[in-house]
Amino acid sequence: MTTENKKGYFGEFGGSYVPEVVQKALDKLEEAYNKYKDDEEFLKEYHHYLKNYSGRETPLYFAESLTNYLGGAKIYLKREDLNHLGAHKLNNVIGQILLAKRMGKKKVIAETGAGQHGVATAAAAAKFGMQCDIYMGALDVERQRLNVFRMEILGATVHAVEKGERTLKEAVDAAFKAWINNINDTFYVLGSAVGPHPYPSMVKDFQRVISQEARRQILEKENRLPDMIIACVGGGSNAIGAFAEFIPDKEVKLIGVEAAGKGLNTDRHAATLTLGTVDVLDGMKTYALFNEDGSVKPVYSISPGLDYPGIGPEHAFLRDSKRAEYVSATDDEAVNALLLLTKKEGIIPAIESSHALAEVIKRAPKLNKNKIIIVNISGRGDKDVAAIAEYLKNK
């Protein structure tokens, strides 16, 4: 099921707003993607590596202690944190790098915020013998030292971007610029369901495995579909992967949780769908956070994977068509959710995923015990432990 209504558009959102030189490269990418996305050999190889390299499928885990503590709906965790390298990112990276190989590319470039996509890209590049350059905002480099070191020992060159807010937006800009300068031999491995067509559709297809598994797993366990799917939203790749197979099931509520940072009434947040306006950002038409002069607003979140001032175009469409609902969680709510899951289930979730858990904590107690929530645990929290310790110390 796709909500794409004409090439590269979801309603009015999406498209490809890029210079001609980039459009030519995107046309070649789209051609290769269309050629291989239903190709039996390609899919066989892709699923082989998902199973044997990434360790899929990931469990759908009944969080019994958390369910009992909150006293309402049954809570299931989709354990994307158990993927190789600790997040959902590898689902997409394996697909894109296998595509790059078939296109004859020798080098890959990627942007990264929390570092998870960078680590996944560096690992897959090492596995498939490709040169790898990663662009990361200098502030994120400071926040995610361990992931930077991981990328480096995997053989990648990490470029710390010192411009602007020194976070994900600047990393995307720098990676894009580097790609344009080396467009013939380089493949841009985009980490989220954002950017110009065909990236949002391609990333969704490679992340769709999350909901393909979750749908089958919940039917096996409960003999029915869930009432609600909840996932955190930065650019939106884990959420679109978790939503994809459930979009046609109108009785299943889809809920995306953005970063409210220090609060929606401050300028320290990244709540794009809550407070953004429609314009062009990073080659796509979507909701984004802009100043009155048209410049992109600085965004903030405790979570380096959620501080992006835009949103994937399909999420913009799902919001406007009312198929999905988008809410937000503050830093405090996310940290409290992280600590609660850790104490109740012995699972340390990523601070990104903890935003989704914060919404579960709000909703589950208000629902009957026969209701079912699936929350996507998009990554594990090892990378965040030092930052959380610092955050709690300064409270």
From Swiss-Prot:
Gene3D superfamilies in alphabetical order: 3.40.50.1100
One Gene Ontology CC term in the entry: cytoplasm
Annotated keywords: Amino-acid biosynthesis, Aromatic amino acid biosynthesis, Lyase, Pyridoxal phosphate, Tryptophan biosynthesis
InterPro entries linked to this entry: Trp_synth_b_CS, Trp_synth_beta, Trp_synth_beta/beta-like, TrpB-like_PALP, TrpB-like_PALP_sf
Residue positions, PTM N6-(pyridoxal phosphate)lysine: 89
Xref: SUPFAM superfamilies: Tryptophan synthase beta subunit-like PLP-dependent enzymes
Matches recorded under Pfam families: PALP (PF00291)
Keyword Amino-acid biosynthesis annotated: yes
Reactions this protein catalyses: (1S,2R)-1-C-(indol-3-yl)glycerol 3-phosphate + L-serine = D-glyceraldehyde 3-phosphate + L-tryptophan + H2O
Cofactor requirement: pyridoxal 5'-phosphate
UniProt pathway: Amino-acid biosynthesis; L-tryptophan biosynthesis; L-tryptophan from chorismate: step 5/5
CDD domains in UniProt: Trp-synth_B
GO molecular function ontology, one term from the record: tryptophan synthase activity
Enzyme class, spelled out: lyase
GO process terms (BP): L-tryptophan biosynthetic process
EC numbers: 4.2.1.20
Sequence similarity: Belongs to the TrpB family.
Quaternary context: Tetramer of two alpha and two beta chains.
Role played: The beta subunit is responsible for the synthesis of L-tryptophan from indole and L-serine.
Protein's name in the database: Tryptophan synthase beta chain
